[in-house]
Swiss-Prot record:
Any Gene Ontology CC annotation: ribonucleoprotein complex
Similarity annotation: Belongs to the bacterial ribosomal protein bL28 family.
GO terms classed as biological process: translation
GO molecular function: structural constituent of ribosome
Name of the gene encoding the protein in the UniProt record: rpmB
Protein's name in the database: Large ribosomal subunit protein bL28
Length: 63
């Protein structure tokens, strides 16, 4: 699935962009996703993983 972490499920968040004159328009915040090769059930698989999961060691990367 696009723009979603395969480990924790973190995805896009919606909100408003507020200008100086308080005009509000919709905008999105995307998670920092990296496409990595990870070991899943003993086989290397390409996954979209957020950087928080990478830094915390929730992903075992393949070489």
């Amino acid at each position: 699935m696009a723009r979603k972490c395969a480990i924790c499920g973190k995805g896009v968040q919606m909100g408003m962009q507020v200008s100086h004159s308080h005009i509000r328009t919709k905008r999105t915040w995307s998670p920092n996703l990296q496409r990595v090769r990870a070991v899943v059930k003993g086989a290397p698989v390409r996954l979209n993983v957020c950087t928080r999961c990478l830094r915390s060691g929730k992903v075992q990367r393949s070489v």
